[in-house]
Amino acid sequence: MSARPKLVVGNWKLHGSLNGNAELLEKIKAAGQTRAALAVCAPFPYLAQCQSVLAGSSVAWGAQDVSAETRGAFTGEVAASMLSEFGCGYAIVGHSERRTYHGETDAQVAIKALRALEHGITPIVCVGETLAQREAGETELVVARQLEAVLESLSVEQLGHIVVAYEPVWAIGTGKTATSEQAQAVHAFLRGRVAACDAGVAQRMPILYGGSVKPDNAAELFTMADIDGGLIGGASLKAEDFLAIGRA
């Protein structure tokens, strides 16, 4: 286990309701200190609710995406400047579901990360391979390509303000989880790629694991030297499970 602080981020995806969110957020807020720092990334309509309910607490909140554009005729887009106006702390960029269903490219993800940073928002940059790519032995090739697009677009100073999340696509929402050793190997590889830019930044950078993290496997994953927490999907919708992961 590393000395880096742990971070556990809940990605609610396309889930939530005003009443349900209020109950979930209040339970998380009332739980007190956990081993890991906690954050929740909610759908855009609920960000103001997160801001209100979590005000004054140690729980951070963020968005699940951010536009690569800054302003203009881009219907449906939400700019980083808009998010930052009311205190958004994080923005997920490059999630595999955005890459797969919305055709986002590595270059677009890099621009989104830059837009977030320009407005004081920490981008959570997601990388990960499909099952076919893993079975073809292309895991490192794929995640390196995805990460390098971001590394090449940012200064060393900016790199010190991002979070990376490794999310093997074959383990998202499938119930399958990479073994702790498989995940650690990719995390170590990713940290090595960052170290090629700056060793100090690499040593400090949080690299999260995302892929069917649950209370019963979080502790083992989080003991790995280069796994600094988790990007949590389904388990983040239940306060008890999310908090258990935060305490792992």
Swiss-Prot record:
The keyword Cytoplasm applies. It is an enzyme of class 5 (isomerase). PROSITE patterns: TIM_1, TIM_2. GO terms for cellular component: cytosol. GO terms for molecular function: triose-phosphate isomerase activity. Substrate binds at N11, W12, K13, G173, S212, G233, G234. The keyword Nucleus does not apply. The active site is at H95 (electrophile), E167 (proton acceptor). CDD domains: TIM. Its EC number is 5.3.1.1. InterPro entries: Aldolase_TIM, TIM_sf, TrioseP_Isoase_bac/euk, Triosephosphate_isomerase, Triosephosphate_isomerase_AS. It catalyses: D-glyceraldehyde 3-phosphate = dihydroxyacetone phosphate. It is found in: Cytoplasm. It comes from the Bacteria. Pathway: Carbohydrate biosynthesis; gluconeogenesis; Carbohydrate degradation; glycolysis; D-glyceraldehyde 3-phosphate from glycerone phosphate: step 1/1. Keywords: Cytoplasm, Gluconeogenesis, Glycolysis, Isomerase. Its main location: cytoplasm. Homodimer. PANTHER family: TRIOSEPHOSPHATE ISOMERASE. Belongs to the triosephosphate isomerase family. Involved in the gluconeogenesis. Catalyzes stereospecifically the conversion of dihydroxyacetone phosphate (DHAP) to D-glyceraldehyde-3-phosphate (G3P). NCBIfam families: tim. This is Triosephosphate isomerase. It comes from Ralstonia nicotianae (strain ATCC BAA-1114 / GMI1000) (Ralstonia solanacearum). The lineage of its organism: Bacteria, Pseudomonadati, Pseudomonadota, Betaproteobacteria, Burkholderiales. The gene is tpiA.
